[in-house]
Each structure stands twice: as structure tokens, then as C-alpha cells.
Amino acid sequence: MLQNSNIRFLFVLMLAFSTSICFSQNNTVSPYSRYGYGEINDNVAGAYRAMGNVGIGMRGKGVINPMQPASYSAVDSLTFMFDLAASGMYTHYEDALGKRNRGGGNLEYLTMQFPIWKYIGLSLGFMPYTMTGYDITLTNSEYPYDTQTYTGTGGFSEIYLGLSYNFFNWAAIGANVYYLFGNVHHQRILSSTLTNYKSISFEDKINADDVRFRYGVQVFHTFDKHSFNIGGIFEAPTKLNGKYKQIDQTNADTLRAEGGFGLPLVYGIGASYTYDNRLTIAVDFLQLQWSQIEYRGEKGNLRDRNKISLGVEYRHNAWSKKYGERMPFRLGLSVQDAYIKQVKDKEFIVSVGMGFPLHNVATILNTSIEYGHRGSSKNLEEHFLRLTLNVAVAERWFFKRKL
């Protein structure tokens, strides 16, 4: 049965969910989002972003982990959870034409999780899948058009529903179903200070939607003060219901086409080790086979993305009366290939963060700061800082009324 306070809590939750949809714009200011679908989101929980974006081998009662659908069955049988995150990003990039800085931010995701049976957990939520956001101006580029402006906005979002079943108390399986939707808009404008030349605009618009699935499995065991968890995830390649339109305002020409878009085969493995509920070490390997899918009707425009993540968390005592001992401290590192062919160098991200417990042990404000580097000074080099804040709330939702 629901408590009265939980009815008010549900109202606030629905309001937050509506707000997240209304303001779910792209949270990237990277010039690299100009290529492909834009920046790719790996569905990492806020608590794990400070741990190098691990998640495949992570399983905990206090974290909603949409990256690994098998983890939902770890939820307590009387607990309702939700997680709301926001982030901000500052980018510094430079090329042969100079140095530039950009900044931006918005709501990141909203996820919920609760038990529907003793060994079954359910999760649902809303989050971005890709993000596009850049605004680049080049001067003295092509006579007589001395200014070129490149802009891009949009991205693809997804709503997911996931189930997980825990059997034998040492293994769990799970699956997510996603509905993906959205659009991406790119524009290039050539302008001139000469009065005899009008501005020229080239536009490129992509619209797509479809349903896809992710499957997960975890095997776990605890003895004495040691806990081990091994997990895996898999997604089959998906062909999107996509349309794109190219507009050349110079000749009033419009090219329209349908199909020719897809999402890659995805697989990943991960493992974590926890000692005495204090120290956790985790490692993930993730591969997305972008080279095998169609983009704009052609294969081979993209390349495979491999990612290795390593993370550490330390919390002295989650039940201590001393506030500092209840705080988790996190550190992480990830190395990955870009899925766009224009970037040959690997991307490196170093992350650090901590959690601030609120009115109970299960409700916590997590913070993470990520520093990343990609590209090279030969073409386009980017340094970025990303700050993520998320509130993970766990409420005692179901109870039996005493007669």
C-alpha cells in the first residue's frame, strides 16, 4: 500500500519527468558532433560516471543502472527509486584557424526502478542517445564569401522499459526495449561583405525513429568480505526508420530520401570486485560495430568504436554516524576510439567524484567531473570539462497496513 507522502512524491516525480522531456536538448558543444549522428551516450548512471563510465559489471541496490538491464533485480523488495541528472560542459578547441571556447548544459536523464515481484525488478526512463551541438565561424575562407558559419542542433532521445529476473541468488538476466526518436539539423552559410553577393545556405536534416532491444546477464557471488560480479550485454544491429533532406538554397534544390540509417551491433563485458562493502574496483570493455551499418544509405562511412573503462569507489562505512565516513569517493579512466573516421586519435577521459548522503543512506547527491581530450593539433584538438550532478532517491514505497 502507498503512503500519503509517496503520493506527493509521485506528483513531483511526474513533474520532473515532464520537465526532462520538455528541456531534453543536446548537452554538447563539441565541434566533433558535426559528424555522424553526433555525440553518443552510453546510458551510464550518474554514480558511475566518476568511475570511468563503467556499468556492465556493476550491481547495487542504490543505483539505477540502465546500461546493464540485468541489474534491476537488485532493487529492494519494498523500495521505489528514481534518479534525475543534469550536466554542464565546457569545451576548448583549436585548429589552424585559432582557439575557441564554448559552454552549455541541460537536464541529462530521468530513470525509475521498483520491484514487481520478489525476484523481478522493473526500470523505465528517458535519456538522450545522441547529441549534436556546435557553432563554428570561419573568416577569410573563400573569396568572395569571406565568412562561413557551421551550426548543428538536435539529437536522438529514447524512452526505455526494462525487466530483470534474479534466479538461484547468483545470476540475473534482463532486457531493455527502447523507443528511439529525434532529428538532427546541420547548416552551412556562406556570407560576404560585398554588396553584390547574397548569402548562400546549405541545410541537412535527418529524422529517424525505431525500436531496439538490449539484453544483459550477470553472475555474482559473495563470501566472507568479498563480492564478485561478472556481466555482459548485447544488442543486435537495427535498421532505423530514417529520412533525410538536403536543401541547397542557391539553386532551390531539395533532395529527399528514406532509409539508409542504422544502429550498430553492441556487445560488452564487465567485472567488479568489492571488499567489505568499502572498496569497489570495476572494469568494462564495450564495442559498437559502426563500420557495419548504413549511414546516409552507405556502409563504411563510420568505424568501430572500442572503449575500455576502469573505476574505483571507496566508502569507509555506509552506516556510520560520521558524515564523512558515509561519503563515497570515486575515480575513473576511460580510453576509446571515435566512431567517426575524421578522428584518428583515441579519446581519453579522467573522472573524479563523490557522493553526499541526504536524509537517509539510500538517498544521495552524486557529483562527477570529467576531463577529456581528443583529436590532435594537426587538425582539430579538443579539451573538455563535464560536470554531472544527479540525485538518486530511494523511498519506502510498499508496506503492509497493520490491522
Task: Report each predicted region and the residues it spans.
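Bacterial N-terminal signal peptides
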Residues: F11-S20
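Bacterial N-terminal signal peptides that target proteins for export
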Residues: M1-F11
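Subset of outer-membrane beta-barrel
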Residues: Q25-L403
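Intrinsic disorder/low-complexity signature
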Residues: M1-Q3, F23, N65
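Compositionally biased regions
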Residues: N6, T19-I21, I230
